[in-house]
Amino acid sequence: MYRDLTMKEISEQQIGQTLQVAGWVENIRDHGGVSFIDLRDMYGVLQVVIRKPELLKGITKEMCLSITGLMEHRDEETYNPKIPSGTIELEAHKIDVLGRVYKQLPFEIQTSKEIREDVRLKYRYLDLRNAKVKDNIVFRSKVISYLRQKMTDMGFLEIQTPILCASSPEGARDYIVPSRKFKGKFYALPQAPQQYKQLLMASGFDKYFQIAPCFRDEDARADRSPGEFYQLDFEMSFVTQEDVFKVGEEVLHDTFVKFAPEGSRITETPFPIISYKQAMLEFGCDKPDLRNPLRIMDVTEFFQRCTFKPFIGRTVRAIKVHAEMSKGFHEKLLSFATSLGMGGLGYLEVAEDMSYKGPIDKFIPEEMKGELAEMAGLSAGDTIFFIADKEDKANYYAGHIRTELGEKLDLIEKDAYRFCYVNDFPMFELDPETKQIGFTHYPFSMPQGGLEALNTMDPLEILAYQYDIVCNGVELSSGAVRNHDIEIMKKAFAIAGYDEETLKTKFGALYQAFQFGAPPHAGMAPGVDRMIMLLRNEDNIREVIAFPMNGNAQDLMCGAPGEVTEQQLREVHIKVRD
């Protein structure tokens, strides 16, 4: 036996008792004649007092110990209110070394978050001893447990889908696994359980979910872990888009209410719904951060009637701000704009008499100035910024200027989680290089208008039943009403340049299953890692994953990816080329 109680179970009730505790040496303090050890386990820290110097012989920080001693009250002047056991201490009578430290520690455990990430990841098992780092993983476990119970309570059945599956074109690069038995054949790790969950609906299951591992060979971002991530994947039969919305917003709202920091404000249900077109206009992106009160306006038509040549023939966006701005602020904002690739950033300041001051004032006819004020809702003290370019670039630039203004002027709502749905995404898009029409997102989404729309409309005008959930500018989930009709599916793929044979080859299981009476179905998949990153207010998603890869998709701790033996390569019929 190594311990009687954990640190969280110890209290003043044990005073006068002989106890055995176990943990790691967090700190050693020598006060001349008496020494102290801060002993840490997963649950907390306990002060151990050493009055026999021989007990400390050979003891160093981060050794794993079992200590037997008498529980005592601390002297009142030495109380530590920062820890639950701050009024008690253990007087050591016996110390057993359970795990020695043979090498110099690469960093101080308590300050591990302050060192270089590559060192932290190489010694992640030490980094995780830091209570602040460990707390994220404990928190993650609690959130996942809650999500699992919530879905079960809502009538969903948890079903595991295969990890080794067939490769299919789903947007990102696959991780492929060679077959030993079938020369030249490969499995793929699933980018998502997409086809399997749809096959479950075709199998007659009504509501499915799982905490699903997903694997994508793509580059890292602050909110995207390379290699592997987890999502709360769910699918439902006999439902509309609105039915899925109700489930998604209930799960996310209730999860954030339970786990968000105390005092946080969370969007009430139903979440606002913003079309893709509206999002691109008002926010400059399809991931709107609703904590930022600034909105983007379209003033294209107005400026076609003015004489400012750089705006004529271009899409013109405007952002109105009511805030004090110095000349230096304008210069910094212009510098930011040029760093994005913009040629400049026009603006007007509104004076008390509602006259304008700014470089483009003289290009607006006098009789039109009141029209601009009414259109943009201008008042004295406002500044309005203008962005002009091709439509896609104007949206992109305006979105970044909006974000920069919100951050630099401290306009972003604090302690808030602001959710929305973004829907009505385009079904198809034009590849700017090949000029070929392809799917915008998931190829098996149901087009709005069904087969008639595919037969009669310009493909680039067709919308899909696709939707995202966005929170604070972070895409938390994507989903769609699925295309379960073979005829609609064949036509949609034909528009995107795929013949029926390709459909059968690449998505054979779905193609075959949908020949036998597939039900209407829809679903979504909120990202677990991103959810926890937001709830913990972490800037990097790797902080909420126990053993994350680095930004280059390397496991610095275990050395993956690594080399394998020639024998292993031969067994799977692979030869590595230089």
For each of these PLM feature ranges, what is it?
Residues 1-578:
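Class II aminoacyl-tRNA synthetase catalytic cores and aaRS-like
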